[in-house]
């Protein structure tokens, strides 16, 4: 993801992470993903906007990612995009254009050295931090 974000500078990059959930979900948990998510594929998507402040996933790359994920029995676990010159915090546009309910939104800030990535749960009007950690690479 960081390589893609660097390559696509000065514009935002975007993509999807897919894999499988492992273990049983805690029905009483406040967070939808309080269990192990094993990421098995990363799908870099084409930013149709080609903009440093906006992204829009190009339809063909999104369809190809969806087809591959379905063929491999994977579910989309997260969407990611970069903020080339701002903090890794959702913008108003990120909230308004969020069509991925129930998946973590990772934002990579290229404004830091090294780049800083944060995860968020988004709704149309609000966002809250998502607890996550890499436990195996």
Regions found by a protein language model. Name each.
Residues 82:
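Residue-level "edge-of-site" marker
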């Amino acid at each position: 993801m960081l390589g893609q974000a660097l390559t696509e500078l000065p514009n935002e990059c975007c993509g999807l992470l897919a894999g499988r959930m492992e273990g049983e979900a805690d029905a009483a948990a406040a967070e939808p993903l309080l269990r192990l998510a094993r990421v098995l594929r990363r799908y870099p998507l084409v930013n149709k906007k080609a903009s440093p402040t906006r992204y829009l996933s190009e339809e063909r790359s999104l369809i190809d990612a969806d087809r591959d994920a379905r063929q491999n029995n994977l579910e989309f676990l997260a969407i990611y995009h970069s903020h080339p010159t701002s903090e890794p915090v959702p913008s108003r546009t990120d909230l308004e254009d969020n069509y991925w309910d129930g998946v973590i939104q990772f934002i990579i800030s290229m404004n830091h050295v090294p780049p800083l990535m944060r995860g968020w749960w988004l709704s149309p009007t609000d966002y809250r931090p998502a607890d996550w950690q890499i436990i195996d690479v």
